Amino acid sequence: VLTFAQLSDLHLDNGPRATARARQVVDYLRPLAGELDAVLVTGDLADHGLAEEYKELADLLDLPCPVLMTPGNHDDRAVYRQVLLGQAASQEPINSVHDIGGVRFALCDSSIPGRDDGWLADETLAWLDSVLGDGPSFVCFHHPPVLLHSWVDGIRQFGAERLEAVIARHPGVVAVLCGHAHTAGATTFAGRPLVVCPGVVSTLVLPVEDKREHAPGLALHVLDDERRLTTFYRTVV
């Protein structure tokens, strides 16, 4: 059994509101972190892609378990690489693969520098195809590749049929995990569950809902030995 948390859309800006909400969620997670197999963070880590924002993030997410991160549309690839990865500045996609407890996490960079919508570059899709094996795996990125019937649909991940073709070749893919929508959600993509993580900095509501403030949220995922994924959503007040 693999148990891990997912956070998304922290939008840290060195301001009091974003910091306080992120700290609420991390303070909730910290006592659990010794029992968690990982913490996954699916993009929009920083609000402006500044070095000081990533430094705040690194301090905040200093946890006793692996922390896996992938960029979103508010992140800056060059600064992200320098501060979080200790690499030379580059605008190439930031893709990474992590094996935890016999499960593979393929983290894909769906961001497009200077834009809010998403797209997986051809090189990213080729990389993804090469790292997905026969064992259980998660495909993770920021932008959802499907319509969610909210205003983020206009800035979703486009070219989804290309990704669908890759996933179709790999039956070991358990689920697709993403963020960007600032709300908890679940649907399907390529015949697999697609799980959307709630936002930390804010919650975006459907047109039929009242536009009021919501508490920050996170997802807790449990993958059992039969490769069944169960997701629990938590709000932190």
Give the residues covered by each predicted segment.
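Beta-strand-turn-beta hairpins that frame and shape the catalytic cleft
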Residues: 1-5, 97-107, 132-138, 188-194, ...
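Binuclear metal-dependent phosphoesterase catalytic core
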Residues: 7, 17-23, 166, 185-237
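Active-site neighborhood of phospho(di)ester-bond hydrolases with catalytic His/Asp-centered motifs
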Residues: 7-8, 37-44, 67-73, 109, ...
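Surface-exposed cleft-lining segments at the edges of enzyme active sites
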Residues: 13-14, 46, 110-122, 146-154
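Short catalytic/ligand-binding loop motif for oxyanion handling, primarily in non-cytosolic enzymes
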Residues: 49, 77-79, 146-149, 185-187
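Extended active-site neighborhood of metal-dependent phosphoesterases/phosphodiesterases
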Residues: 50-127, 162-172, 190, 202, ...
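Active-site-proximal segments of metal-dependent phosphoesterases and phosphodiesterases across multiple
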Residues: 135-174, 181, 205
